[in-house]
Amino acid sequence: MNSTINNDINNDINNDINNDINNTQSNSPIEAVIFDWAGTIVDFGSFAPTTIFVESFQKEYDFAITLQEARVPMGLGKWDHIQAVGKLPSVATRWQAQFGKAMDNADIDQIYNTFIPLQKVKVVDHADPILNAINVVNDLKKQGIKIGSCSGYPRAVMDVLIPAAAENGYLPDCVVATDDLPYGGRPAPHMALKNVIELGVNSVTNCIKVDDSTPGIEEGHNAGMWTVALLLSGNEAGLTAQEYQQASVQTLNKAREKARLIMKKSNPHYLIDTINDLPAVIKEIELRLIKGERP
């Protein structure tokens, strides 16, 4: 897709979004739900970024990392993610043995500069919505709840992913990329708060952050929001959509517990399997807000 067509699609999406925001009256005490992208709304298992991290290390430095190592810092901005992978004891030891020095910023820049073009090409292959995600989002919109979003992807990747997701029916009211703001991304609250500003939200306590990574949940806490962690559709379980649908109860229980042990470290208000389970949480938070409770 060339840049002119891409820009036209993004402009059309933004025009539609602004009209929707202005014409919708909220029937809920919840003002906005802010979603992560990969592993939350699209890309079941969050495979697009992780597989490209593995490929980027291999291509740039002939250095092997495992998919599991690539998953550990998920949720951070991608430059920070590469840095965090390099600091993993297992990776740092192998890097020192192979190159005789620790990974430095120049190395991270090289890997990042390899990662971005690869990710732009392949992100559209992972733009399929997670089961029932579009229905859940559209039902929230019908209630007058605004849909925000933010991602660990930089804007260059989001400019490819946004129109691909739109073709599949996902049209958030706001999209913030990890390099849109000068102060950096997660776990700081800047991207979530940028959504608050752009959406015209009156109180962060009336917002919910939904994410499949601990930095994303910490982002929500730091922004003063309710937080909902996803266990089975995201990075920590690492299942494909097909594996999830075909898995036995035992397999799902094992994957759920594995993810729960990681995600509970960020103290989410709620832990659910996938976005399909979100409506019940929405109702509970609505009742808590009506009673005067806050995150």
Swiss-Prot record:
Biological process terms from the Gene Ontology for this record are:
DNA repair; organic phosphonate catabolic process
Presence of keyword Thylakoid: no
**Cofactor(s) essential for the protein:** Mg(2+)
Q: How is the cofactor bound?
A: Binds 1 Mg(2+) ion per subunit.
Q: Name one GO cellular component term.
A: cytosol
This entry's Enzyme Commission designation comes to 3.11.1.1
The catalytic site is made up of 36, 78
Provide the GO MF annotations for this entry.
Answer: magnesium ion binding; phosphoglycolate phosphatase activity; phosphonoacetaldehyde hydrolase activity
Q: Which residues of this UniProt protein bind Mg(2+)?
A: 36, 38, 212
Q: Would you say which domain of life the source belongs to?
A: Bacteria
Q: Which UniProt keywords apply?
A: Hydrolase, Magnesium, Metal-binding, Schiff base
Keyword Oxidoreductase set for record: no
Query: What reaction does this catalyse?
Result: phosphonoacetaldehyde + H2O = acetaldehyde + phosphate + H(+)
- What job does this protein perform? Involved in phosphonate degradation.
Subunit info here reads:
Homodimer.
Alphabetical list of PANTHER family matching this protein: PHOSPHOGLYCOLATE PHOSPHATASE (PTHR43434), PHOSPHONOACETALDEHYDE HYDROLASE (PTHR43434:SF19)
- Family according to the record: Belongs to the HAD-like hydrolase superfamily. PhnX family.
Name of protein: Phosphonoacetaldehyde hydrolase
Which species expresses this protein natively?
Answer: Psychromonas ingrahamii (strain DSM 17664 / CCUG 51855 / 37)
